[in-house]
């Protein structure tokens, strides 16, 4: 049950996790930027239909 055989595993994993975090953040930003026009279009379309 000892993990002394993989000493260089945790720093690599932390860097990978940090990279994934930054990528997910940028993906979230880009997804919101691309989703806003669609949301505005849907809202205006719904208002036009309702009115």
Curated annotation (Swiss-Prot):
Which residue stretches belong to region Disordered? 1-22
Pfam families per the UniProt record, alphabetical: MIAC (PF23701)
Q: Which GO terms describe its biological process?
A: actin filament organization; regulation of epidermal growth factor receptor signaling pathway
Described function: Reduces filamentous actin fibers by interacting with aquaporin AQP2 which leads to inhibition of the expression of SEPTIN4 and integrin ITGB4. Also inhibits the activation of the EREG/EGFR signaling pathway through interaction with AQP2.
The UniProt record's further free-text remark is: Inhibits head and neck squamous cell carcinoma (HNSCC) progression in vitro. Also inhibits renal cell carcinoma progression in vitro.
Q: How does it assemble?
A: Interacts with aquaporin AQP2.
- Identify this protein by name: Micropeptide inhibiting actin cytoskeleton
Which organism encodes this protein? Homo sapiens
Q: Which gene encodes it?
A: AQP5-AS1
């Amino acid at each position: 049950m000892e993990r002394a055989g993989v000493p260089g595993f945790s720093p690599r994993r932390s860097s990978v996790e940090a990279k994934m975090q930054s990528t997910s953040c940028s993906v979230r930003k880009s997804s919101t930027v691309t989703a806003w026009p669609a949301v505005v279009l849907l809202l205006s379309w719904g208002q036009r239909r309702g009115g």
